Regions:
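Short, basic (Lys/Arg/His-rich) helix/loop patches that form interaction surfaces
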Residues: 4-15, 25, 79, 95-105, ...
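Conserved tyrosine-mediated DNA breakage-rejoining catalytic core shared by Y-recombinases
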Residues: 3, 34-98, 102-110
């Protein structure tokens, strides 16, 4: 339901790439938001996860982004791309070319981040979570409207539960266990 809603929503389609990458690869939020174009290889279908983007409070400078090592030693890894993930990266690149959006920040020497906002700054996990909240709200409103109009029978009504971007990591783990 979620992925179909994103694919068919003009308003929320720009969220499809990062959500696809997080669901399909099981990346932590900081790993996904810290990905740079040089960390992915569309030819070999591999993602190099070798750092994480962190957001921290600095006493004098306020809140800042930084780069850190992955959470655990096993966090340094090569993640294979599914066809959906490869398509998501291609979609993100095309979206950025079409809109003129590009990374405008350098963080601890790292630049060219893939998932940036309309200002060219790195996505923050709380921004992703706010986007997910709006997606859930509008998707569920659409489903309820279809039910009220008779397009969907009440017994077939499915609504999205509340979840966060970290839940997408758990969704990936569940899918892998079920495979």
């Amino acid at each position: 339901l979620l992925m179909n809603f994103l694919k068919n929503s003009e308003k929320y389609n720009h969220w499809l790439p990062i959500i696809t990458v997080m669901v399909e690869c099981g990346l932590r939020a900081g790993e996904a938001t810290g990905l740079r174009w040089e960390d992915i290889n569309l030819d070999t279908g591999e993602i190099s996860v070798n750092h994480t983007l962190i957001y921290y409070s600095h006493r004098e400078k306020g809140c800042l982004y930084g780069i850190n090592t992955p959470k655990t030693e096993a966090g340094n890894r090569i993640v294979p791309m599914t066809p959906e993930v490869k398509a998501a990266f291609v979609q993100e690149r095309e979206y950025q070319k079409k809109t003129g959006i590009s990374c405008k920040v350098t963080i601890d020497g790292y630049t060219d981040f893939i998932f940036v906002n309309r200002f060219g700054e790195c996505q923050h996990h709380s921004t992703i979570n706010k986007g997910i909240d709006r997606i859930i709200r509008d998707c569920n409103e659409e489903q309820l409207a279809k039910c009220e109009s008779g397009t969907i029978k009440p017994k077939n009504l499915v609504l999205l539960p509340k979840f966060s971007c970290h839940s997408l990591r758990h969704t990936c783990a569940t899918r892998l266990c079920e495979a």
